Amino acid sequence: MSHLFPPSSPVAGKPLESPQKEPGKLANTSVLTLGRKRYNYELEEYPTPDPSSSIGRQSSPVKDITSRLNETKSALSSPSKQEKVLAGPIEIELDASDPSRLAIGRKKSVCNIILPCRKNISRQHAFISYAADRNEIKLECNGTNGLSVHLPYSMQLHLVKPFPTRNFYKLVAEEPLTSQNTKQSHGKTLQKNQNFISFVLAKGETVTFPYIQGSFINFTGVTVCLSLKKVAPYPGDGNNNFDEENSTETEDELCLLTTTSDDFSWQKETPSMKFVPVEHSPRTEQISKPLLIASPALVKNSPISYRTTPQTSFVINQPSTPKKLKRKSISLKNNTIQETPLPKDKIIGTLSASTRSGGINEEESFAAVAKKTKELSSTTAIVSPAQKRLKTSLNIIPEISRSLSERGIRFDDLVHVLCNHLAFSNLQQTPLSQLQNINSNTSQLSKDELKKVLETISCIGIIVREGKDASGKPLEDEYYYDVENDDSDERKILYNSLKGRSRLRSCRKKHKQYFWKRPTK
């Protein structure tokens, strides 16, 4: 029987006790039948298996109230519904004193008049300007969805296209001569009814029309009313009782008064300066400058007083005597020549023997000094090793190349092999004996010949070694590659690219210890 009576079903033969219904309405016996309706719902509205507090209610009253409140809140919070509720015409006040162009659209950063944010309104939908002298409004449409202009039907207006090639239209009061042709040419017609005249503007079209109070523009659902800004009248225009004498003048309106005008008194209030007589005033001494013509022997340097100001640290020199010219240290008093002392190892004989005679003039003494200094500079000229090497290489190259060509060895190929071997070798410097065993061509050369060839190459440096090694043999000269003096750009680029190749140090990096660690016992 358990499968016939589930837990929520009523017990057969038991009367239903429902608080909403009277107990006499239901049958005392309920017959359980399978395959057809258990109760007649036309007579009984809601047969419930078990009584509860919410029997007969379609929903809880508390839930119903909260749902209604939520609906009203959502309706107010929705921006689209708010616009519908609060929708009204937007007013544009045109300033007669300002003929500038105003932008109308939904983007705040680029527009002067902001429209609601709707998808059918462009960011910059239109541009409007007002010309007060002609009482005309110029309207340019920049929106994709266009706009419509509505004017009150107060006067007869006609839509004209003055220029056939431009999208420019004009509303005029005079009827054009060929009205039929104009309508066919521009394809626009005025829609007239009892109250308004309206026409549509597409994107890129411009129209000028006279300002009429009560005109408005429809931006695909948003209405914009046009009005003129009220300007406060000037006090002197409408008021005839304006007192000019008692009015307050501004600074710009004040007149400048000259000192010679009658408004200024001629009495001097400032006391005049008077000289105070001094009984025993010191007499001013007149300083006379001495003549600058004097003999050079008697000229003496006077002490120079330095004057410094606290603002600057510049030294002001005021020499009272002319400055003595620096010349060669030759004194003609005893007819002797004083020369600058030379180093001890390069002392040359004095010119006392040649200048003892008193008949030598100043020009001869200068010539003698110049001759001696020239001889001294020629004897003490030091030639750098690089210059010596360059001179010797220029003289030796033809001889070496001739001797090598007789053996069938090209000089350029030999230089190329030696430079490449020293540039790309793992050793920083290579002894001469190892360079002799590079290939068959270098092995044919003797040490002296190979040394001469190496001296002619500018990008190969030499390390001269003197002495003997442990076995008693003399130490050999070692040669290295100098990249800065190399003429081959290709070898330079290849050498610089292979600079970071792996060395002995890189294989030991993984064993390097970067911090102190206590040694293990």
Curated annotation (Swiss-Prot):
Q: Does the keyword Iron apply?
A: no
Where Phosphoserine occurs along the chain?
281, 295, 302, 384
Indicate, by first and last residue, each region the UniProt record lists as having compositional bias (Polar residues).
Answer: 51-63
SMART domains found in the cross-reference section: FHA
Instruction: From the UniProt entry, list the residue stretches annotated as the region Disordered.
Output: 1-63
Protein name, entry field:
Protein PLM2
Q: Which organism is it from?
A: Saccharomyces cerevisiae (strain ATCC 204508 / S288c)
Q: What does this protein do?
A: Binds to the promoters of genes with functions important for the G1/S (start) transition; primarily genes involved in DNA synthesis and repair, chromosome segregation, nuclear division and transcription.
Question: From the Swiss-Prot or TrEMBL record, what is one GO molecular function term?
Answer: chromatin binding
Q: Where in the cell is it found?
A: Nucleus
Record flagged with keyword Phosphoprotein: yes
User: What are the record keywords, sorted?
Assistant: Nucleus, Phosphoprotein
Q: Can you list the GO cellular component terms from the UniProt entry?
A: chromatin; nucleus
Pfam families from the xrefs?
FHA
**Residues covered by the FHA domain:** 102-156
**GO BP field:** DNA damage response
The family note in this entry says: Belongs to the PLM2/TOS4 family.
Domain of life, per lineage: Eukaryota
Which InterPro entries would you find in this protein's record?
Answer: FHA_dom (IPR000253), SMAD_FHA_dom_sf (IPR008984)
Q: What induces it?
A: Regulated in a cell cycle-dependent manner, peaking in G1 phase. Negatively regulated by transcription factor SBF (SWI4-SWI6 cell-cycle box binding factor).
Post-translational modification as stated in the protein's UniProt record: Phosphorylated by CDC28.
